[in-house]
Amino acid sequence: MLDARKNSILGYLGLNNKSDLIISVGLIFVVAGFILPLPAVILDVLITVNLVISLLIILIVLYSKRSLDFSVFPTLLLVMTIFGLVLNISSTRLILTKGINFDGQMIRTFGTFVVGSSGIQGLVIGFIIFIIIIAVQFIVITKGATRVAEVAARFALDALPGKQMAIDSAYSSGNLTEEEATRQKNDLQSEVNFYGAMDGASKFVSGNVKVGFLITLINILGGLLVGITLQGLNFNEALNNYVSLTVGDGLVSQLPSLLISTSTGLIVTRSISKNSFGGEIFDQFTNHLGIYWIVSGFLLFLAFLPGFPTLILMFLSLSIAFLAYSLSGIRQKEEIDKKMKLEEEQASIYSDKDVSPVVPLDPLALEIGYNLVPIVDDTKTSELLDRIVKIRREIAFEFGIVVPKIRIVDNMRLEPNAYSFKLRGVEVGRGEIKLGKFLVINVGIDSGIDGDLVKDPSFGLPSLWVNDDGRETAEKLGYTVVDPPSIIATHMTELIKRHSYEILTRQDVQNTLDVFKKDYGAIVEEVLKNFSVGEIQRVLQGLLKEQVSIRNLVTIFETIADFTSITKDIFFLIEKCRQSVGRQITSGYLDLNSELNVITLNPSFEQMIIDSRVESNHDLISSIDPNLKTKFIYELFKIVNEVQAEGFYPVVLSSESSRPIIKVITSREIPDLVVMSVLEVPQNIKVNVLKTVEVEE
């Protein structure tokens, strides 16, 4: 926005893309002023420019709502300091060389008219004014601004880690978008850099004040020396000419310096606000209108005391009373308008035109009871919020999907220690936490550890809630012990993995295609020629539903493209994509010897499963006899438990045709069962058959 405004102004002046050139040329001329003598007319112009720029600077500071709105200020301080020194050197050269014939109007005017008197009296008055300005600048404004800049720089740097963590927490909880978080971090870094620069730049201001005073003293002595010894003037003539011009030069150079010093003090003491400095003054001075009536009454009281200026005090008293009356009327009008607006808003709640059937739901949300609010408190370091950031990153790396923002809200309807994880407004998992305690996972009944017996919310394993003493005992016995944030984070991770296929939307697929197209345009073009985004989404969802990562999109899209001319059967394409990433799938279930231990099915029963396949456009079901299905589930469940008891991970290996039907049949009773087809196993992997499921017809 600022760049557009700058370009429009420069474009109007015919100086597009030449701002840097203009500043560079200006700085060269400034440096040249150290060497080249300037005519009095040019000196008057430059003195006026110095005064105008200083006035612009203080006005910009007053109208800025925050320090970063004028972030170039520290650099500008250095430039203006150099510019002022150049003017001092040039004016000194002209005064000493021209003497009586010096015709610089700005310096002569400040030496006579501004002082208000001429002769020796004017010199004394001018020098006193000069000393007062120097004292105010150095002792009051500059010293205070320097100290404030030092403290602000230190505090800004100390607060940086905490503010960055607060931004990360707000982003991970869904209160900030990625763009907003990035912008706030950039603003935070800019703020630290600004106050760090101001800490050093404030030294320019104090140094400039000291140098200004020193230059004036040197000019007075030098002027008297040149006038008396070189030009033959007596002391009074030299005093009237050289000292008068030197005082005028000192005043005309210290006025811009005073404005810049004041600007420095203002900008380092400003806090972030919605209004400018003037707006803040007005708002805060009108918060308490009763004080104006008190001041008015006090002035009226003073007006009747002997010796006080009665008319002036009465005029001021009436003016302040009128101001208080006017502000009261404005305040009453604002309150009436505010009340009417509130009534309109309340009425609009019941208005049909504001009722919309489309209410956006959070893709993912974690709702917590009020006792769990401290573990997500972003005013201090929150382990859970940090974990959420890591969860999103890890799942993106493991499964190849972008997990949307997880919004964290407190829900008074939940039990105080409960939490609920929701997917688009529907609960997919919940648990209960005991703050101050730890959960010992997978303990036996006779473990010898005292605690409350519960089930682990993530995997359903028998667990115990224990205190610190029980934690130490459990760790010595070799049990896994986790704290409350870890419990919630682990549960959320498993729920997101389990429902990753539901999280993936068409828009996510389209965004992936847009990014993927930049490097693999040929594949994307070939796939989109025959498949819609929705069909591609269904293939990817079919893979995610069985915990198959879709990070290897190149292989997956190439597989889809290979079969575009053969079929558009989604279930067939899912199987072919599984086979194309078979090495990836198999690697997750190999034992320490890189061998695959599996459970197989009786061939005749497997054929029955294949024959029971019923396929529609959007679903795949089995028409197998319910009694046979029950027997099969029973036998399979028994074998799975036996295999697990022997220390193996249960994996069912079947043919390509039966694999998806077996998964459909077992998805409700054994949802986490891994079912692979023979074609998914690489040829160099040794397969060991542990058990075979036999089902009697």
UniProtKB/Swiss-Prot annotation:
Keywords: Bacterial flagellum biogenesis, Bacterial flagellum protein export, Cell membrane, Membrane, Protein transport, Transmembrane, Transmembrane helix, Transport
Superkingdom to which the source organism belongs: Bacteria
GO BP term, pick one: bacterial-type flagellum assembly
Magnesium keyword on record: no
Location of the protein in the cell: Cell membrane
Membrane disposition: Multi-pass membrane protein
Cysteines engaged in disulfide bonds, as pairs: none
Signal sequence bounds: none
Transmembrane portions of the chain: 22-42, 43-63, 70-90, 122-142, 211-231, 247-267, 277-297, 298-318, 355-375
GO cellular component, one term: plasma membrane
Keyword Transport appears in the UniProt entry: yes
Its job: Required for formation of the rod structure of the flagellar apparatus. Together with FliI and FliH, may constitute the export apparatus of flagellin.
NCBIfam families according to UniProt: FlhA (TIGR01398)
Similarity field: Belongs to the FHIPEP (flagella/HR/invasion proteins export pore) family.
Protein's UniProt name: Flagellar biosynthesis protein FlhA
